[in-house]
Structures are given as C-alpha cells and as structure tokens.
Amino acid sequence: MNILKLTPSCKDYLWGGSRLRSDFGIKSDLNPLAEAWVLSCHPDGPSYLADGTTLADYVTAHPGCLGTDCEKFEQFPILTKFIDAKNNLSIQVHPSNEYALKNEHQYGKTEMWYVLDCEPGAFLYYGFDHEISKAEFEERIKNNTLTEVLNAVPVHKGDCFFIPAGTLHAICKGIVIAEVQQNSNVTYRVYDTAVWGRTASPAPCTWRRRWT
C-alpha cells in the first residue's frame, strides 16, 4: 500500500486566524486561514495528491487503497479538518442522515472535536441547558438571548467532544481543533453574533428549515 501525501483545501472564513500556518505548518496564502480540509473527498474542498489528482479521483481509480470493507460505503465516509477559531463561529446545527438525504441530497453530519490548543478561559457551546419549545427558540433568536439557554462548556488542550447530528453547537474564540466528521458540508446557521474584519453581512441563517 502506498503512502499518500495530501495537500489540503483551505478556507478563509471571517472568524479564522493564522495559527494553522504559524503553529501547524499548513501552507496557504489565505488570510485569515480558518480551516484546512486535510483528508477530504468532498467536492467543496477536496484534498490533492502531489500530481494534482484529487483524493476522490484516486480512490475511485484505486478502490483497494481503502481495504476490503470499503464497498459497504457509497462514498468516502469521513472528512478531517483543522480549525482555527480566532473569533466565535455561528451557533449552528447539522442534520441527520435521514433529513439531509431527503432535503439536501447528501449525508448529514455527526462530528468529533479534539482540542489541539486553546486560550485561557476558552469555551464552546454544546446543546441546550433545558428542553425548549419551538416558540421559545424563535423568541430567543429574535431578542438575542439564545446563548442564555446554551451549555457554555470550558475547554482545555486535549479535550474531546462528540457532537451528534441535531445538536446545537458553536466553536468559540481562541480554540484550535482537529475535527473528524461525516463526509458532508450541510450546516444550518442558527445565530450569528458578529462579522469580523471585513465589510460584509452575516451569512443568512437557515434555522427555519430545521423546524419545518
């Protein structure tokens, strides 16, 4: 079996920083450098081999490179990223396989985070602190109090978090994460708190889709 050296696809989302380049050796001219998709067959950000072939095309041409059990998967099953959150991400949720296949024509997203590093006092949002109704959810978005009913979880270097599809969550500022997730790019943004560093409007929130 050959060892494949991959070049990641990188993303310059507004909340990103520079630590993926300075601390983790990711080569990219993007500024900010928010994400590096280091193992990816997803069309929104494929990994590349040295000759310019995408990992997806290589796997299609050499299916045996994944071993004997890969035939049970319709597509490459995972996507691995490095994430540098210099600022807060949107509060968001990812759909289940059932919902995403029906409405987005791709798989949903369950993911896992490993905290590579973080600033003192860093935290993330992970789920509600109590069960809320649709009416309360809508009202708290309108009056900017949604974070009052979310679990704010302190994080430390080496922590690991499992985020099942359907869990409201957000990576907050000062955290660098390795993320292993399903091979999907479906995200419903629920709540944007700010836009950083550029003249721009927040991405349109798509939470209503999840409640219909």
List the predicted regions and their residue ranges.
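Transition-metal
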Residues: M1-I132, T193-T212
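Flexible, active-site-adjacent loop/turn segments at secondary-structure boundaries
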Residues: S22, K81, A135, N144-N151, ...
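Conserved metal-binding segment of the jelly-roll/cupin
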Residues: I91, P154-K173, Q182
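Short, well-ordered, mixed-charge alpha-helical segments that flank or form enzyme active sites
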Residues: Y99-A100, G121-Y126, I132-F137, I163-P164, ...
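A short hydrophobic beta-strand segment most commonly corresponding to one strand
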Residues: E111-W113, A170-A194
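Active-site glycine-rich loop that binds ribose-phosphate moieties when present
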Residues: I132-F162
